[in-house]
UniProtKB/Swiss-Prot annotation:
Its EC number is 6.1.1.20. GO terms for cellular component: phenylalanine-tRNA ligase complex. One of its GO terms (molecular function) is tRNA binding. PANTHER family: PHENYLALANINE--TRNA LIGASE BETA SUBUNIT (PTHR10947:SF0), PHENYLALANYL-TRNA SYNTHETASE BETA CHAIN AND LEUCINE-RICH REPEAT-CONTAINING PROTEIN 47 (PTHR10947). This is Phenylalanine--tRNA ligase beta subunit.
Length: 781
């Protein structure tokens, strides 16, 4: 919204300069985006009249002009403008004047002394044709200072309004805001009813009453469409961003800027029969004022006569009924079109109009009569003519329901004491009707405020007018108490830090994934499909973290990163109801960073399993299990407290080939909820007595997992046994080909006494018996 500050100050003139006024508007929520001078600085330029323009004796393209500049004698000025002619009134810069980039001095031009310069718009820094002198109206007073006469000491104010403030898309609306903010008196232009002088009317019917709940029309005959638009009106239109055209059109545009009510003038002689407000019919087209012919859709509101659509309601008029210089009779239209009936239609047709911009946000349905009377009076004053009576069709207009505002809630939300009298005064200044009942205010918003509907809207208005910048800064005051820390859970940040300490880097990948990739990892998986995917390759929700981790691996390998260790903590999506959090990881390349002291080797299953055991702080129970994404001979299900907590293993060979990898990465995925649980640590004193170690070699079936044997031994172990670990797996000479030999190291220590040989032998025997009973294992000879 752009407007002239001088025009605004005709309506409300607070004791603030331009900068202070802009700051006050911005602080009240009406952001001033730009302040632009109406004209660049120049001085000593006056209105002049060319008395004569003779050809220069020594230059074909120059003229020697005698110019009346309001002084006793005419001034001689040499001019090269092609349109310099006697009788023209033009700007004249006298000697000593300073124009943008130039200072005027008395100078000889081809032997003729010139006492000033006749100016074009370009030389003054103004808009307009620059190929000749700037021609002023015939009524321009000779000798008058040009800046004062053209009101060039003005500022163009540009507001960046939010969509809810449609009431500020007019000078009256902005003036009302300034008055409420500053307390200055607001002088809203009053339009007295114009008495009809003729009885002519146009019949109006509204078929789409939901879209148009009020329509006013008026016939005005005998106008002079070629009448000159007054300079003050043309100036205000131009500074509001609207180019003056014909006087009748300028009048409707002026009312648009002043009152915020879009209007339209039809050439009455081009209308056939009455006016109907209806929805467009299939196949109808309309040639618009812009020259564009559009095909109308059935959800577009049109103004139609007997021949068909003549205007796109609330957006743009039609070419066939446009007002021209020869137009004598017009039909003025002012209406309230529902925002929902206009919104989006202009953009769909590639149009952007001031009318659509306002109707989409909501215009004041209570001021349509005032707009019609104002436009009629201006039209009669400028173009003459005889007005007819107003034809009106009114349906169900929007209602402004009362809103209850609790002063206690206002103070609590605002954080500042606002008195009832002040709140009532501020809301009344905005046009609200306010009634007080104890500590409650019952507020009825005005017809032009579509954005006031609930209590919070009124709180915003009260605080806005009080001034956001006046609310004192208060640091929050609250009791400080220590919160108990749940030591039975590991926080996500602690889990991430542990993974970083284990030499893994965190990654965050898309939750949206390619369905082909998910099904490659698990052909039987049930995918959760998105209703509106951002891309076809991101159309399902991930059911595992592995897909994103593998893509991250490939991304790094393509950038010559040969050693990759990454993890992600995030949700997977089995269904709408089941969305567990998982910890997934991947290791690829060398087990350790390259260095001279340790021979290089690739990371394997047991490296990653060891990382997870360090993460848990205890040995993991890795049992048999098959996952379609993992190598069947290099994978395991991970069990925690009797529950399957996840998977670990090398990527399946078919997927290594499918993902074009040189080797198989080792993957793991764990339920983060199981990971987060942990037992409270218990203190155990250090034993002062020596440890005893025994190495046992058990022969058992080759297909039996080492974990099964360890589980049996640990379950049978007496309290004196501190550790049971596998340190060798032998298959070969001396062991049947269907069997294997597992070497177990047993560490024993008592906290009360030194263990005797008998104690040790008894403990070992319990382990041997358990191995035989549970695993059919025997001691190797």
């Amino acid at each position: 919204m752009q407007f002239s500050e001088a025009w605004l100050r005709k309506l409300v003139n607070p004791a603030l300069d331009t900068t202070e006024l802009a700051h006050a508007l911005t602080m009240a929520g009406l952001e001033v985006e730009a302040l632009t001078a109406a004209a660049p600085p120049f001085n000593d330029v006056v209105v002049a009249e060319i008395l004569s323009a003779q050809k220069h004796p020594d230059a074909d393209r120059l003229r020697v002009c005698q110019v009346d500049i309001g002084e006793a004698a005419p001034a001689t000025i040499v001019c090269g403008a092609p349109n310099a002619a006697a009788g023209l009134k033009v700007p004249c810069a006298r000697p000593g004047a300073k124009l943008p980039g130039i200072e005027i001095k008395v100078a000889k031009v081809r032997g003729v002394e010139s006492f000033g310069m006749l100016c074009s718009t370009k030389e003054l820094g103004l808009e307009g044709a620059a190929d000749g002198l700037m021609v002023l109206p015939d009524d321009a007073p000779v000798g008058e200072d040009l800046r004062g006469w053209l009101n060039l000491d003005d500022t163009l104010v540009t507001l960046k309004l939010t969509p809810n403030r449609a009431d500020c898309l007019s000078l009256v609306g902005i003036a009302r805001e300034v008055g409420a903010i500053t307390g200055a008196e607001v002088r809203i232009p009053q339009a007295s009813p114009v008495a009809p002088r003729i009885a002519d009317t146009v019949e109006v019917t509204v078929a789409a009453s939901d879209a148009c709940s009020r329509y006013l029309g008026r016939v005005v005959r005998g106008i002079d469409a070629q009448a000159t638009t007054p300079r003050w009106m043309a100036e205000r239109l131009e500074r509001g961003g609207i180019r003056p055209l014909l006087a009748p059109i300028d009048v409707t545009n002026y009312v648009l800027l002043e009152l915020g009510q879009p209007m339209h003038a039809f050439a009455l002689s081009r209308l056939s029969g009455g006016i109907e407000v209806r929805l467009a019919r299939a196949g109808e087209t309309l040639a618009l004022l812009s020259g564009q012919t559009v095909e109308l859709s059935p959800d577009m509101l049109v103004i139609a006569d007997a021949s068909g659509p003549v205007a796109l309601a609330g957006i743009m008029g039609g070419q066939a009924t446009s007002v021209e210089r020869a137009t004598v009779d017009v039909f003025l239209e002012a209406a309230f079109f529902a925002p929902a009936a206009i919104a989006g239609r202009a953009r769909r047709l590639g149009l952007s109009t001031d009318s659509a911009h306002r109707f989409e946000r909501g215009v004041d349905f209570g001021a349509i009569h005032a707009a019609m009377e104002r436009a009629t009076q201006l039209l009669l004053d400028i173009c003459g003519g005889q007005p007819g009576p107003i034809s009106e069709v009114t349906g169900s207009l929007p209602r402004r329901e009362p809103i209850e505002l609790r002063l206690s809630r206002l103070r609590r939300v605002a954080g500042v004491e606002l008195g009832a009298d002040q709140v009532i005064r501020d809301l009344a200044a905005l046009g609200c009707v306010v009634e007080q009942a104890d500590e409650r205010l019952v507020v009825t918003p005005p017809s032009f405020r579509f954005d006031l509907a609930i209590e919070e809207d009124l709180i915003e208005e009260a605080v806005r007018l009080f001034g956001y910048d006046r609310i004192p800064a208060r640091p929050p005051a609250a009791p400080s108490r220590m919160l108990a820390q749940d030591e039975t859970r590991i926080a996500d940040d602690a889990l991430r830090q542990k993974m970083v300490d284990l030499d893994y880097q965190e990654v965050i990948t898309y939750s949206f994934v390619d369905p082909a990739g998910e099904q490659a990892l698990d052909p039987d998986v049930r995918l959760l499909t998105l209703a509106n995917p951002i891309a076809s390759q991101l159309s399902v929700m991930r059911t595992t973290l592995w897909g994103g981790l593998i893509e991250t691996l490939r991304h790094n390998l393509n950038r010559q990163q040969e050693r990759v260790r990454i993890f992600e903590l995030g949700r997977v999506y089995a269904s709408l109801a089941e969305q567990p959090r998982k910890l997934g990881g991947l290791a690829y390349g060398e087990a350790l960073p390259e260095q001279w002291g340790v021979p290089g080797r690739r990371v394997d299953f047991f490296d990653v399993k060891g990382d997870l055991e360090r993460l848990f702080g205890q040995p993991l129970d890795a049992g048999r299990g098959e996952h379609p994404a993992l190598h069947p001979g290099q994978s395991a299900a991970l069990w925690v407290d009797g529950h399957r907590g996840g998977w670990i293993g090398a990527l399946h060979p078919r997927l290594v080939q499918a993902f074009d990898l040189a080797a198989a990465p080792v993957l793991f995925e764990l339920d983060s909820e199981i990971l987060a649980r942990r037992a409270l640590p218990r203190h155990a004193g250090l034993s002062r007595f020596p440890q005893v170690r025994r190495d046992l070699a058990f022969v058992l079936d080759a297909g039996l997992a080492a974990g099964d044997l360890l589980a049996a031994l640990r379950e049978a172990a007496p309290a004196s046994i501190r550790a049971i670990e596998v340190f060798d797996d032998y298959r070969g000479k001396g062991v049947d080909q269907n069997q294997k030999s597992l070497a177990i190291r047993v560490v024993m220590q008592d906290t009360e006494r030194t263990l005797t040989d008998r104690d040790v032998d008894e403990a070992v025997q319990k382990l041997v018996d358990a191995a035989a009973r549970r695993c059919s294992a025997t001691l190797r000879a």
